[in-house]
Design a protein with these regions (language model features):
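Loop-centered beta-sheet repeat module
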Residues: 133-171, 175-181
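N-terminal hydrophobic targeting/anchoring segments and the immediately downstream early-domain regions
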Residues: 1-133, 184-188, 194-260
């Protein structure tokens, strides 16, 4: 578990504190086979699991404990020496069931950011694996972007198709992010889905121009595409992609988005 000492998995409280990391964004991911009410329940249960971690005796015994980040003051407090916080971020709009009322419900539960799609289509937009017409935001998706901005929630374009990215850029009035991505410049020989999952240079540049950030992830296929037998993708490859992103989007427009 999160407070265990077996050091299994990618993340636990002890390792976060050892590295000096104050804030952890916690993804509320919904698989594509969950839609409608099933997607809503799945995401609500996911949020409940994070709440259970924060409310647990193991967390309360820490000095200081992990806290919920619900606004700017919470974030600033968590980023001070000795502060620690969780920020909940929904990955894919399927749990909203096409309803701004559901957005309000998840906002009340502590969700403070939304990745509009996760590869597949939902009520708000088309994902990067979508087939057929190159459409982007739906009518609900456009309402959703405005509603997210009105609530001060982060808008994430990871996993979106090109039309969804263009549509969102055309109406957004606040900074946008891509929380975990590769760059299409390194995928000239990759299969279509991997190319679609990566950002073009123009897209990365446009996201950074909003005052936002493009975060490069560390998945080998996302960095360089399918590997030749026996070839490992390593730190040098990640640095090469990050350096290209900085050339395109500027140093202030690039971050790390491990996707682990």
């Amino acid at each position: 578990g999160f407070f265990g000492t077996d050091r299994l998995g990618h993340l636990d409280s002890a390792r976060l504190r050892e590295t000096g990391q104050n804030v952890q964004v916690m993804a509320v991911y919904t698989p594509p086979d969950r839609t409608g009410d099933a997607a809503y329940r799945y995401a609500a249960d996911f949020v409940g699991a994070y709440d259970a971690v924060l409310d647990s005796a193991a967390n309360r015994s820490l000095d200081p404990p992990w806290q919920r980040i619900l606004g700017r003051a919470d974030l600033e407090r968590a980023c001070r020496p000795g502060g620690y916080g969780f920020l909940l971020f929904m990955e894919g709009a399927s749990p909203l069931r096409g309803s701004l009322g559901d957005l309000d419900r998840f906002f009340a539960l502590g969700v403070r950011g939304l990745t509009i799609t996760h590869n597949h289509d939902n009520e708000a937009a088309r994902g990067c694996f979508a087939e057929g017409p190159d459409s982007g935001l739906t009518a609900f998706g456009r309402e959703l972007v405005a509603a997210l901005e009105a609530r001060g929630m982060a808008i994430d374009l990871a996993h979106a198709n090109g039309a969804t990215i263009r549509d969102t850029l055309s109406i957004a009035r606040r900074p946008l992010i891509d929380s975990h991505t590769g760059l299409r410049a390194f995928h000239r020989a990759s299969p279509p889905q991997l190319r679609a999952r990566a950002l073009g240079d123009d897209e990365a540049r446009a996201i950074a121009a909003t005052g936002g950030v493009v975060c490069i992830d560390f998945l080998p296929d996302h960095l360089k595409g399918p590997r030749e037998p026996g070839r490992r993708v390593g730190l040098d490859d990640a640095v090469e992609v990050i350096a290209h992103a900085v050339d395109v989007a500027g140093v202030d427009g690039v971050g790390l988005g491990s996707d682990w």
